[in-house]
């Protein structure tokens, strides 16, 4: 059975275009995979704490020397990673905020990037350990940035996902959403065409 993991990272709980379009893509993937299991990870509703000394300390303390608090922190990270590893297809709703990703998504990445667990260092360089996944990134943007130097979001996402082993990444852009009604309609129509083709 196919498992689809949808990760919503918008800072708004209602009306975020990246979430709405990610919902549409997940529904389309369900139609293409009858019986698929869908898991939704809402990074706003289930917020993760930003990295701090206690979190980093837990990650870098050997298992046999962790405190109860550190074990709880690592268990949370392990659960997020297990959820990711169990998915066959991953849909990420990723709005562009100030040329990058939301702090919610960055924090999620910080909680799943663990040496020896989701990547490892070898004599030939780092190797990602989350392999065999198809990833769709649905990004919503107020302006038009794709293919320009101002799009630091796309290369960052491709780099991070590739670093942990997810190299089959498809980007769906909804750009120009704040450039007026006509531009918004065109952006959403273009994104929906890409969703239909995914």
Swiss-Prot record:
Keyword Secreted annotated? no
Q: Which keywords appear in this protein's UniProt record, sorted alphabetically?
A: Flavoprotein, FMN, NAD, Oxidoreductase
Top-level EC class: oxidoreductase
The record's GO molecular-function terms, alphabetically, read: electron transfer activity; FMN binding; oxidoreductase activity, acting on NAD(P)H as acceptor; oxidoreductase activity, acting on NAD(P)H, quinone or similar compound as acceptor
What EC number(s) does its UniProt record assign?
Answer: 1.6.5.-, 1.7.1.17
As cofactor, the record names: FMN
Cofactor binding: number and manner: Binds 1 FMN per subunit.
Q: What does the record give as the reaction this protein catalyses?
A: 2 a quinone + NADH + H(+) = 2 a 1,4-benzosemiquinone + NAD(+); N,N-dimethyl-1,4-phenylenediamine + anthranilate + 2 NAD(+) = 2-(4-dimethylaminophenyl)diazenylbenzoate + 2 NADH + 2 H(+)
Q: Which spans are transmembrane here?
A: none
The answer, when asked if Flavoprotein is one of the entry's keywords, is yes
Q: Which Gene3D superfamilies match?
A: 3.40.50.360
Which residues does the record give as FMN binding sites?
Answer: 96-99
> InterPro entries attached here?
Flavodoxin_fold, Flavoprotein-like_sf, FMN-dep_NADH:Q_OxRdtase_AzoR1, NADH:quinone_OxRdtase_FMN_depd
Question: Briefly, what is this protein's role?
Answer: Quinone reductase that provides resistance to thiol-specific stress caused by electrophilic quinones. Also exhibits azoreductase activity. Catalyzes the reductive cleavage of the azo bond in aromatic azo compounds to the corresponding amines.
Q: How does it assemble?
A: Homodimer.
Sequence similarity: Belongs to the azoreductase type 1 family.
Q: What protein am I looking at?
A: FMN-dependent NADH:quinone oxidoreductase 6
- Organism this protein belongs to: Burkholderia lata (strain ATCC 17760 / DSM 23089 / LMG 22485 / NCIMB 9086 / R18194 / 383)
């Amino acid at each position: 059975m196919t498992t689809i993991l949808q990760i919503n990272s918008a800072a708004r709980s209602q009306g975020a275009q990246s979430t709405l379009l990610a919902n549409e893509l997940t529904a389309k993937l369900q139609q293409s995979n009858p019986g698929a299991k869908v898991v939704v990870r809402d990074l706003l509703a289930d917020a993760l704490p930003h990295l701090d000394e206690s979190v980093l300390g837990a990650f870098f303390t050997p298992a046999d020397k962790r405190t109860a608090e550190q074990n709880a922190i690592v268990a949370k990270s392990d659960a997020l990673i297990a959820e990711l590893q169990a998915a066959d297809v991953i849909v990420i709703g990723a709005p562009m905020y100030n040329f990058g990703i939301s702090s919610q998504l960055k924090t999620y990445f910080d909680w799943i990037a663990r040496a020896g667990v989701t990547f490892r260092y070898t004599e030939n360089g780092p190797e990602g350990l989350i392999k065999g996944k198809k990833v769709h990134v649905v990004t919503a943007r107020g302006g038009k940035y794709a293919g320009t130097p101002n799009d630091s979001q796309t290369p960052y996402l491709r780099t991070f996902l590739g670093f942990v082993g997810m190299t089959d990444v498809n980007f769906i852009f909804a750009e120009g959403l704040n450039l007026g009604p006509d531009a918004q309609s065109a952006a959403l129509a273009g994104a929906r065409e890409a969703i239909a083709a995914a």
